[in-house]
Amino acid sequence: MDASTLFKKVKVKRVLGSLEQQIDDITTDSRTAREGSIFVASVGYTVDSHKFCQSVADQGCKLVVVNKEQSLPANVTQVVVPDTLRVASILAHTLYDYPSHQLVTFGVTGTNGKTSIATMIHLIQRKLQKNSAYLGTNGFQINETKTKGANTTPETVSLTKKIKEAVDAGAESMTLEVSSHGLVLGRLRGVEFDVAIFSNLTQDHLDFHGTMEAYGHAKSLLFSQLGEDLSKEKYVVLNNDDSFSEYLRTVTPCEVFSYGIDEEAQFMAKNIQESLQGVSFDFVTPFGTYSVKSPYVGKFNISNIMAAMIAVWSKGTSLETIIKAVENLEPVEGRLEVLDPSLPIDLIIDYAHTADGMNKLIDAVQPFVKQKLIFLVGMAGERDLTKTPEMGRVACRADYVIFTPDNPANDDPKMLTAELAKGATHQNYIEFDDRAEGIKHAIDIAEPGDTVVLASKGREPYQIMPGHIKVPHRDDLIGLEAAYKKFGGGPVGQ
């Protein structure tokens, strides 16, 4: 596409050089800029990428978007704008032909449950023989092909490219985990959502947002912006068991479907039965009551299942068809995942990293604990420490607790575990500043019949260490290796 055509929608700009050049790529990553690319520089929290403009010029890039004029060769066109990332969004959606308009787009937000709900929607679509894509904490997936991702919600250009990739692969729908960071930072500008789903709102990310009010406002942006084009059928799915849904109902102009277990809602779960093999319940709907069975464990997953079913149903699939699909879904990786049922202990990994998430996790497993419940939890570095003692208090619902860091980054691991220990309500705990050693200790003290829960990371494949270096780490593999060494069995899978 000709650059002059691309920039027609950008009204506030100063152009230094010629826009008469062909463009086939936009990037915010200086390492990928080349001839035919537009490089968009920005001022981030840690890095000002304007300093890479000369490097991209050396790589053959002839067009940069900047917030102030740079000292560059005369053959490099500079487009100076006040907000480079907002312009990046406009350019990306224009160049890639508004890809989110070409499929059904589901957006899932909330403190806990985003990954589970989003993954369930994707898996239901696949069971229905529909081409589907997923993007979130567990990476990027088109049908069954997976690639890793860096952020729950990538920056705007990368996100648009992923949606375009899904469209080109024939995806009929795409499900996005929508983080509060992504909403506030404008990473989702221009994405056309068809269905927005809310799970819950509990304390998290106050290091970024400052207050719960600001955090809640960030989440609400998905719902308030959903109605920008009222000519399309768009829907909102809200959890009535969370009081924040009342506010979200007031900010969206779209039709709302509610679900709940404890509070009255249009769609409800009754007569709940739970085990470590899954759940069953009566799904009470405006159209009748249906029996639902699922391999997902825990009462909180019933809420997630309902949210996913309603979202898919809202776009035209019958509930009967969806329920059949739900009964045969695969587990969501790293979400209340029981590792190797042949072991004499119940070894479980989960992503729970807030007090609310941990409470729900313990609620889910405690009825099935045969002997002791051993619970390992970590605290992330450079995050909101005000939530940490409450996490320690909740963890002490278990018989024995192990406190570790989780992605300590530049914080002192001993400080992080000490913050967790401030909330301890009994003395049956120990602190490890090395998470892997903490996991090995959990297995070492476990006896047949015990339940060992490794919380906070799920299947996240790394630890963020000082200097923000990512070091390979897998809770599940470390736990299984230690368990096989102690109890026999194996080998450890990948």
From Swiss-Prot:
Pathway: Cell wall biogenesis; peptidoglycan biosynthesis. A motif (L-lysine recognition motif) lies at residues 406-409. Its EC number is 6.3.2.7. The keyword Endoplasmic reticulum does not apply. It comes from the Bacteria. It is found in: Cytoplasm. This is UDP-N-acetylmuramoyl-L-alanyl-D-glutamate--L-lysine ligase. It comes from Staphylococcus aureus (strain MSSA476). The gene is murE.
